[in-house]
């Protein structure tokens, strides 16, 4: 008798639990978490699919879920001719993806010196690591004020961030973890660059003009009080580095904590 053939499994396979599409260019998905995976909120892993030749095609993706979560969440762009995202955007519940359980990254609390206020500057899907950090209780223990800025071209591209903030502030699990008073530390500042909205403009321009600080009632940014994390396009990373260093902040790393950090692996 022939033994039934086993279903082939991918190396480092994880199962898709949920997929949510926001626009024709943006979607998020959740997968099972390997039992052995330990990570710090803000880190990224390599995920992907098998190519037709049987070799894995992997890209760096920030984990959007916090370190305490049983599931892993990711937030992605869809690039129609992109080697990976052209296929990844079609995944559905029950499918398998490859996930290499070796997390790394610079957007972690360990890379920053203690401060009073933390700025999380994101464009597009660069909000993903901050979705993890904003659901991490340590963030609320370490800082008196937590400011998330999220800039997208169109208003509907802000939906993921809007849902995230709503989930955090609705008095559910996060208020149990950190207390309702701590959640009042969180300020959300979304901006658009193309669609009309309440706040328009690039965050770099709003910082340089002083409008951002004025809107938030903040006198200034200094290395004594302020810490920052930056995740977005290459242009944003470069421009914000100059602006933050103009305020006297120095770039930090896991090995040498300082005042701000930039995720170099992410560009999108």
Question: For each of these PLM feature ranges, what is it?
Answer:
Residues 129-139:
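Histidine-anchored nucleotide/phosphate-binding helix
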Residues 115, 140-144:
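Conserved S-adenosyl-L-methionine
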Residues 118-121, 229:
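Conserved beta-strand elements of the Class I
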Residues 123-128:
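Ser/Thr-glycine-rich phosphate-binding loops at phosphate-binding pockets of nucleotides
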Residues 2-95:
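Ferredoxin-reductase
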Residues 103-113:
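A short, basic/flexible loop-to-alpha-helix module at the beginning of a structural domain
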Residues 6-12, 149, 156-268:
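Reductase modules of NAD(P)H-dependent flavoproteins
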Residues 112-117, 223-224:
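Short helix-loop-beta connector
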């Amino acid at each position: 008798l022939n033994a039934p053939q086993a279903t082939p499994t991918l190396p480092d396979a994880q199962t898709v639990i949920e997929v949510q599409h926001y626009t024709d260019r943006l979607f998020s998905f959740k997968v099972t978490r390997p039992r052995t995976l330990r990570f710090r909120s803000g880190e990224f892993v390599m995920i992907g699919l098998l190519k037709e030749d049987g070799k894995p095609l992997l890209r760096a993706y920030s984990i959007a879920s916090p370190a305490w979560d049983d599931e892993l969440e990711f937030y992605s762009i869809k690039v129609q001719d992109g080697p990976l995202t052209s296929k990844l955007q079609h995944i559905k519940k029950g499918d398998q993806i490859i996930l290499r359980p070796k997390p790394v990254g610079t957007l972690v609390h360990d890379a920053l010196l203690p401060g009073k206020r933390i700025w999380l500057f994101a464009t597009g899907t660069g909000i993903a690591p901050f979705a993890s950090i904003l659901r991490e209780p340590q963030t609320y223990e370490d800082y008196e004020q937590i400011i998330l800025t999220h800039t997208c071209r169109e208003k509907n591209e802000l939906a993921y961030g809007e849902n995230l903030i709503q989930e955090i502030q609705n008095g559910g699990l996060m208020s149990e973890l950190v207390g309702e008073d701590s959640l009042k530390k969180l300020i959300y500042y979304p901006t658009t660059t193309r669609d009309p909205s309440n706040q328009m403009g690039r965050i770099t321009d709003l910082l340089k003009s002083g409008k951002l600080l004025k809107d938030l009632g903040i006198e200034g940014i200094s290395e004594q009080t302020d810490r920052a994390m930056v995740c977005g396009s290459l242009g944003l990373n470069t421009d914000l580095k100059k602006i933050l260093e103009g305020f006297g902040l120095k770039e930090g790393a896991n090995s040498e904590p300082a005042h701000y950090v930039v995720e170099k692996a992410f560009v999108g």
